[in-house]
Regions:
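Short alpha-helical transmembrane segments in multi-pass integral membrane proteins
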Residues: 1-22, 80-147, 189-245, 301-368, ...
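Residue-level signal for short hydrophobic patches within transmembrane helices
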Residues: 15-34, 38, 61, 65-68, ...
Length: 454
């Protein structure tokens, strides 16, 4: 496997190994944020606040689908990482094969289901009448491109499980730049309105996914499977789905709470949607960085668990906790100091009302970034040793907390209660995961280092 330029995460100083792996992922996530920001900025500044609200009103449901895709493909990647850490090339190839099969079948089901549910989804989200048609157009096109999202995440998670976090970064950078160019072309000279922004996103990701797959096949000989290895194995698929589906559902459950928040914001009106969307876009900066380190710790823990190195797992988790705490403090301070520049990035001559909605969100959520970092670290560490029930239970608790604030407390306390739903959900989920992590690590230290069966 050395010829494949894979990376062994079971050796070296934990924080250096994790940081070296995570930095390209952070770079990729920042570019991903860049093109979503560019998407919103181009839409808002060329088409107006209503167009920005139309795109923003779909953000949560698009993220909901994306989270399930990332969870499903990420779960498959965990098993691949464990096999790679154990040096079992046969299982690595089996994992690659079944990941492709699962991705192909899932793409068909997901695309048909999502495209047929656009109207019910928009009604559920209380989408305002004045932006309904634009919102429908944007969301339907994005759903048509689900296949590109599935296969990009599939190949990215396969490569990361093999220790390569740079190749996905390079193609994400390409996709980001292409997306911005297509945004401008489709919206300005072609006058395609929000449909242009949607098609730009879909085409950019599809091209990136295709090129990434071709490049990976040329670079990594371990991905060259024989016809026999491509045969579908129900047993192998079930092993992957037992990890992938709980992770997908877990990440989607988190988004259900965000859907409740979006619905509550939509009830307030277009100004609230615009302010909430602008603040949420820059808030994603910290979330994406934390998620990138979470991907790093997931692959690190999976490989070391496969190699039976429990001490390295504990050190790596602690090092990640310290890194994220420092980064979240710095990013939080930057966002709060620069909050007055957020809305003008997306809307020309914004009203005072839109500015206030954005400010309220940031000053409510940003001070609690510490809990987000800890949540992502402990959740991914627990998942990567094969335990899926605890992270899923934590997500159910998180869902209940978000719905309580967004749907119940927002009635008497208004918009601020919707904003507070996010940090409150982080804290409640973390209260379960930390004790579970401590107990789990003690059991593994006691010699029970076989893969957890759920």
């Amino acid at each position: 496997m050395a010829k494949d330029r894979t990376k062994d995460l079971t050796r070296g100083t934990p924080w250096k190994v994790i940081a070296g792996f995570s930095l390209p992922v952070i770079g990729g996530n920042l570019f991903q944020l860049f093109y979503t920001l560019a998407d919103s900025m181009i839409v808002g500044r060329t088409l107006g606040a209503d167009a920005l609200a139309a795109v923003g009103a779909t953000a949560t449901i698009v993220y909901f689908v994306l989270c399930f895709i990332q969870g499903l493909t990420g779960g498959c990647g965990i098993l691949l990482g464990q096999a790679f850490g154990a040096g079992n090339e046969k299982q690595v190839r089996e994992s690659v094969s079944v990941s492709v099969w699962i991705s192909a079948l899932f793409t068909i089901v997901l695309t048909v289901l999502c495209c047929s549910m656009v109207h019910p989804i928009l009604r559920m989200l209380n989408t305002p009448v004045d932006i309904y048609d634009r919102t429908y157009t944007y969301l339907f096109i994005i759903f048509l491109g689900n296949g590109a999202t599935v296969f990009y995440n599939m190949i990215s998670n396969i490569l990361r499980a093999l220790g390569d976090s740079r190749t996905p970064l390079y193609f994400l950078i390409f996709s980001s730049l292409l997306n911005v160019v297509l945004d401008v072309v489709f919206i300005v000279p072609f006058d395609m309105d929000v449909a242009g922004a949607a098609w730009a996103t879909v085409l950019a990701q599809a091209i990136s996914a295709a090129l990434c797959i071709v490049f990976a096949l040329k670079r990594f000989t371990i991905l060259h499977l024989s016809a026999r290895e491509w045969r579908f194995s129900a047993e192998t698929a079930w092993r992957h789905l037992k990890v992938g589906f709980p992770m997908g559902f877990q990440m989607s459950v988190m988004c259900i709470g965000q859907l409740a928040m979006q619905a509550a914001v939509n009830r307030i009106g277009t100004s609230a949607i615009a302010g909430y969307t602008a603040a949420n876009k820059v808030d994603q900066l910290s979330v994406l960085v934390d998620n990138a380190v979470g991907i790093g710790i997931a692959n690190y823990v999976a490989q070391n668990y496969g190699a039976g190195k429990m001490d390295r797992i504990k050190k790596g988790v602690w090092h990640c906790f310290l890194m994220l705490t420092a980064m979240n403090f710095a990013m939080g301070a930057l966002l709060l100091l620069g909050q007055s520049f957020v809305v003008p990035m997306f809307v020309t001559n914004p009203t005072a009302e839109i500015m206030q909605y954005s400010k309220d969100y940031l000053f409510t959520v940003v001070p609690f970034y510490f809990f987000l970092g800890a949540l992502l670290i402990y959740r991914t560490a627990i998942q990567s040793v094969g335990n899926t029930w605890a992270p899923f239970a934590a997500c159910v608790i998180e869902l209940a907390a978000r719905i309580l604030c967004a749907s119940v407390l927002s009635v008497p306390f208004g918009y601020r209660a919707v904003c507070f739903a996010t940090p409150f959900a982080w804290l409640t989920a973390l209260s379960l995961l930390i004790p579970v992590y401590i107990v789990l690590i003690r059991k593994l230290d006691g010699g029970q280092s076989t893969q957890t069966k759920n």
